[in-house]
Amino acid sequence: MPRDDPITEEERRANSATDLIRMRLARLQQNIDKPAPIPIKKETLRAPKEPLEFVRNVVGSSAAAGSAEFHIYRNNRRKEQNRLDYIDAVAKKEELDDAYRHKVEKLEKEEESKTAKKRAKRLRQKAAAKKRKLTKKNNESDESSSDDSDSDSGSGSDNESEGKQNTEVEDKDKVEKEETDDEKTEVST
C-alpha cells in the first residue's frame, strides 16, 4: 500500500533521533519564511512529594555531625524550601483568582444596571409612542365624527360623546395592559 504523506515516510527512514532532528531542520531551512512550531511549556503548579512516614537516616547528635551529613541537611532544606514556595504560590494564585472573580462580578453588576436603565428608557419611549399613536387616532376619529355630527341632527351628539369617552377609556386600558405584558416578557428574557 502506498503511503500518501512523504514527510512521515521520510521520518520513518531515520536511523536515530539525531537523523530525525537533522531531517526536520533541513525541511525547516528549505522554507525559511514559514514560522517554525515552537511548543510552549505550560507552567503547572505541582505539589511537592509528601514527607516520608519513616525517616531512616536521622542524624542523632549535632556534635558528631561532620561534613558527611551536610548533604542530608542540604536535601532536607531544599525539600522544605520547595514546600514553602509551593504554599506561597498557591496562596498567590488564590488571591489573584479572588481578585479576578470580584472584578468580573463588579463588571456584571455595572452592565446589568446599564441594561436595566436602557430597558426602562426603551419601555418609556415605547409607551409614549403608543400614547401618541392612540391620541392621534382618537383625534382623527374625533375630527371625522365631528364632521359627521355637524351634518347630522344635534339630538344624538350627547350619546355619541359618551360612546367616545367609553371607547377612549377602553383603548387606554388596552394600552396599559399591553405595556405590562411587554414589561413582563422583557423581564423574563
UniProtKB/Swiss-Prot annotation:
Locate the compositionally biased regions of type Basic residues. 116-136
InterPro entries the UniProt entry points to: Prkrip1
List, in alphabetical order, the Gene Ontology terms for molecular function in this entry.
Answer: double-stranded RNA binding; protein kinase binding; protein kinase inhibitor activity
Which spans does this entry mark as compositional bias, Basic and acidic residues?
105-115, 161-177
Region annotation (Disordered) ranges: 105-189
Composition bias of kind Acidic residues appears in 141-151, 178-189
What name does UniProt use for this protein?
A: Uncharacterized protein F37A4.2
Tell me what organism the protein belongs to: Caenorhabditis elegans
